[in-house]
Each structure stands twice: as C-alpha cells, then as structure tokens.
Amino acid sequence: MTAPRTLYDKIWDDHVVHQSEDGTCLLYIDRHLVHEVTSPQAFEGLRMTGRKVRAPEKTIAVPDHNVPTTEGRDTKIDNEESRIQVEALDRNARDFGINYYPVSDIRQGIVHIVGPEQGWTLPGMTVVCGDSHTATHGAFGALAHGIGTSEVEHVLATQTLIQKKSKNMKVEITGSLRPGVTAKDITLSVIGLTGTAGGTGYVIEYCGQAIRELSMEGRMTVCNMAIEGGARAGLIAPDEKTFAYVMGRPHAPKGAAWEAALAYWKTLFTDKGAQFDKVVTIRGEDIAPVVTWGTSPEDVLPITATVPAPEDFTGGKVEAARRSLEYMGLTPGQKLTDIKIDTVFIGSCTNGRIEDLRAAAEILKGKKVAPGMRAMVVPGSGLVRAQAEEEGLAQIFIDAGFEWRLAGCSMCLAMNPDQLSPGERCASTSNRNFEGRQGRNGRTHLVSPGMAAAAAITGHLTDVRDLMMAPAEPA
C-alpha cells in the first residue's frame, strides 16, 4: 500500500522523468511562461547552438515588466533598454513559434495574471517562469516557481528542469476572516510570523477554512507571496471553485478531455496521515488589516500598532530595524495611522485582478483622493481593464482622482516609467518593499487594495474598517 502523500508529493511524483542516486531529479515541465527581461539571453543561447524550442505549444510569452502603462506604448517605448527587450521578445516569439500576447493585444498583461486568465494554468501542472512570483499559479494546485535565465534556456530546449525535492510545509489558517481582512493580510501575516527565511527549503501548502473561503483571486494573492517567506513554491489543493474558474477558459480542456482532466484533478489533495516537515497554524479571526513598516515583507504589523524600536528586536535584527527606520524616515512609537502617504499604487501580480479593483472601488465610491495625492490603478491585464470599465469601476477611480492606466507590472518595480522619486512614500498593493524597489530611495508600505484606497482618501495610512460603509461625500 502506498504511503500517504502530500499534494506536493503527488505532483512531484507525476513529473519525475529520472532520479539520480543523490536525489537530483529531472522534472517534466507542463507550462513555461516567458517575459521580456529574463528571456533574451536564453533565446540567444538557442540560436547559438542551433536548437529549437522543444514545446512551443506549451510556451507562453508576454511583455510586462518594462512596458509603459500609458497610451502609445505599442508604437513607441522611450527607454532604449526596455524597447530593445520588448522588441527582442517580439522577434523571439515569432522566430520560435511560441504563444505570444504583444502590447497591442487586449489579452496582454502581467504574465501571472494572463496565464490563469487564458486557461494555461491548470491543476496538477508544473509551471515555471523566469520570475520570482511564479508561485502565484500554485493557487490552482499547480507546482509553480521561478527559475533563472540559464534554466529558462534549459526548459526552452528540453521542456525539463533539473531539481532536488523540497521539504513539505503546511500553513493552516483556521476559522474565518473578519470584515476588512483580505488574502493580502493573510499572506503578509504569515510572513510576519515566520520571517522571510521561514519557508526556505520548503514548498508550502496553504489550507484551512479561511483559505477555502477565499476566491481564486484571493488564493492567487496568498500563493504569490510564498517566495517572500522564503519558500520554493506555494500550493492550494484544487476544489469546486478552482474547477469553476478554469472551465471555459480559452486553453482549458473541452468535452471528454475536460472530464478526464477533472477526474485527475479531484485526486490532487493531501492524503490523510501524510507528514509535513513543518506546520504553522494561524487563527483567521486573529488576523487584522496589516501594513509593512520597514524594508522587508516580514516587517509587518496590524494597522492599529505603532512603529517598533530597534530595541524591540534581538540579534542581527536590531541593526536591520535601525537601518529600516532610517531609510523609511519613521520614528519608534509613531502610530502607523499617522504616517503620511504621497502616492498610492493599486495593481501588480499580487493585487491587479478584478476582485482587487472591486474592493478598492467599493472604498472609493463617491469619495476623492486627498489633496496632492498621486494615485494610480494599473489593471493586471487588458481583459481585467475592459471588465473594470464595463462594471463602472474605472469611472469610480477616475472620479476619485486616480490615474487609470494600461496593463503592466508598473510601479511594482523600477523597470519602467512608473517610479517613485527619492523620499516619496507609497501605499502599494505590490509584493516587495525593499530599498529602491519602486524607485531610488522610494519608501514602500505594502497593503491590501482596500487599505490602499483608504490611504488615498485620507492622505495617511488608515484602517480600512474605519471607511467601510462610510457615507459618500455630498456632490
């Protein structure tokens, strides 16, 4: 009789092509997602050796990191390096015959939003991309993680990847979330508890009632930030919500193929009695709306807290806290809700989906951004943008004083025109608050979409629960 297995064990076992004596495995890769930044050298390597892409039908490319989010980008990109990389992806997609969504295509967007949206991401698959936040696709019960440029070339050429198996970690969120608390608060709270190295060497399976109650968009938010907790990947077992989301997508199975796939997908769960190497349990009702105060995703506190002092920490974290406070321009004991905000960014592969825009618009409806506030919404794909316009969300953002942009990675990272100026402080729905991440000497506070919208209205970090159901301003 086979020993009980975790979800990770099952997907791994189904994809091992060969295993060496030292445990190193050759894994088959079902989907390879490609963008303009980490792929040029890989494609050039194929050209130099006369190789083709092994499985072009399983390779999907989209420009997202470097592309401007303003009109006219399909004809002109001002930054030379960005233009060269986007043009290279255009050429490589054409030359090697892979699936491609150029900036002129309404389906273009952030690769981790486009993949699920188009039905490329399916339960039980192995998914890789030359990008840290590939774990997003784990929300579907897929084994998904980032790879380096040399590995991108290896997958393009062979549709396989050399790997050693990680350990199993379970993160269980019991009970239900309270009003105003979101998937973003879950994932930040987990990282705040375990630290950015807590998941190192592990693949995390997220489970528990609070996870099951999340939408697919929420589950993608949770898995998206698994890497920020040090994990190789994050997984959530597929269920009826997963199947309903996938059904009818352009590249999802149809007819008899759907029924066969569904039968397999229903086996993708952790067996009773399966062993995890590490277990973390958090009560959902104990999670509050949170915000980061420092320069690491683990620097997270409830919005009702105060800025910590270096002396609140031990070991090497004392100096790290001192450096973070200096960089962020904060004072120990200062209320988080007293921190003034210059800019609000709603978007990214963490929170750029339609549900995220709905949550922010609900807070903003009938209100205006604070005087002097720079605020932008960047939908995660052209299709998300179109749906938001159809639902009237775009007009809510525009009426409130937000910029309504085209799809792309935008201000998540300083690789395109959407950047912070030195000293500028941003409430951001993205995933990293490192020094300079959003622009040289820019200051980033990671929050949920609702929290970002609340900060835009008040001009400072704000508990979104204070604005929920608040009356709109008179016209």
Curated annotation (Swiss-Prot):
Keywords: 4Fe-4S, Amino-acid biosynthesis, Branched-chain amino acid biosynthesis, Iron, Iron-sulfur, Leucine biosynthesis, Lyase, Metal-binding. [4Fe-4S] cluster binds at C349, C409, C412. It holds the Pfam family Aconitase. Its EC number is 4.2.1.33. It catalyses: (2R,3S)-3-isopropylmalate = (2S)-2-isopropylmalate. InterPro entries: 3-IsopropMal_deHydase_lsu, Acnase/IPM_dHydase_lsu_aba_1/3, Acoase/IPM_deHydtase_lsu_aba, Aconitase_4Fe-4S_BS, Aconitase_4Fe-4S_dom, IPM_dehydratase_rel_enz, IPMI_cat. One of its GO terms (molecular function) is metal ion binding. SUPFAM superfamilies: Aconitase iron-sulfur domain (SSF53732). Binds 1 [4Fe-4S] cluster per subunit. It comes from the Bacteria. Heterodimer of LeuC and LeuD. Catalyzes the isomerization between 2-isopropylmalate and 3-isopropylmalate, via the formation of 2-isopropylmaleate. HAMAP family: LeuC_type1. Belongs to the aconitase/IPM isomerase family. LeuC type 1 subfamily. This is 3-isopropylmalate dehydratase large subunit. It comes from Cereibacter sphaeroides (strain ATCC 17029 / ATH 2.4.9) (Rhodobacter sphaeroides). The lineage of its organism: Bacteria, Pseudomonadati, Pseudomonadota, Alphaproteobacteria, Rhodobacterales. The gene is leuC.
